Curated annotation (Swiss-Prot):
Enzyme Commission number(s) from the entry: 2.7.1.24
Signal sequence segment: none
Residues binding ATP: A13, S14, G15, K16, S17, A18
Catalytic activity as recorded in UniProt: 3'-dephospho-CoA + ATP = ADP + CoA + H(+)
Pfam families: CoaE
Ranges where the DPCK domain occurs: 5-202
GO BP, one annotated term: coenzyme A biosynthetic process
Principal location: cytoplasm
InterPro entries attached to this UniProt entry: Depp_CoAkinase (IPR001977), P-loop_NTPase (IPR027417)
Organism: Xanthomonas oryzae pv. oryzae (strain KACC10331 / KXO85)
Protein name per UniProt: Dephospho-CoA kinase
């Protein structure tokens, strides 16, 4: 059972998955909020609440969530995005904590893209450390256009819909700069792993 939990966050296209993969190579369990978010919107009470708020047009013909339709709606409307987060975040938080505590390791990483937007440590008081993957906004923009084939306008909207780089850095206990050099990412992971293992033994 892990009694030391690190929250990993960063902006869209910052390289959170790449950093999480480096920790996994060292045997560290990683609980992914994106995966948990997909699980909690499977047919059930959370999906029912989403449909009640946004209408049946956010469902596919098989009764599952049409993620693309819902994503387009909430990115276009800040108020609707907040409504969606109010429905999904409590269920996601609960499952993330349960999975992290159940991990059989000295510590666990919980990857939470919207950690800053959800109030940082106030929203997740059970986190022992917050690790931020930092990347210049221009590089985020470039990666979104390459990775997701996003238009420049959509990339701007996706970045603007999240917390600012400065807001993320303000909640960080630890920061890793991910400018695309894998060797530097690996070195940073090894350094942090040693630190977290030492802290978990205290």
């Amino acid at each position: 059972m892990s009694d030391f939990i690190v929250g990993l966050t960063g902006g869209i296209a910052s390289g959170k998955s790449a950093l999480a993969a480096e920790f996994e190579k060292l045997g560290v369990p990683v609980v992914d909020a994106d995966l948990v978010a997909r699980q909690v919107v499977a047919p059930g009470p959370v999906l029912d609440a989403i449909v009640a708020q946004f209408g049946a047009e956010v469902l596919l013909t098989d009764g599952t969530l049409d993620r693309q339709t819902l994503r387009q709606r909430v990115f276009a409307d800040t108020a609707q995005r907040r409504v969606l987060e109010a429905i999904t975040h409590p269920a996601i938080r609960s499952e993330l904590q349960r999975a992290a505590l159940a991990a059989l390791a000295p510590y666990a990483i919980v990857a939470i893209p919207l950690l800053t937007e959800a109030g940082g440590r106030a929203g997740y008081p059970w986190l022992d450390r917050i690790l931020v993957v930092d990347v210049p906004v221009a590089l985020q923009h470039q990666r979104l256009m390459q990775r997701d084939a996003a238009t420049a306008e959509l990339a701007d909207r996706m970045i603007a819909a999240q917390a600012t780089r400065e807001q993320r850095l303000a909640i960080a206990d630890d920061v890793v700069c991910n400018d695309g050099v894998l060797e530097q990412l690996t070195q940073a992971t090894h350094r942090l792993d040693a630190d977290y293992r030492a802290r978990s033994d205290r």
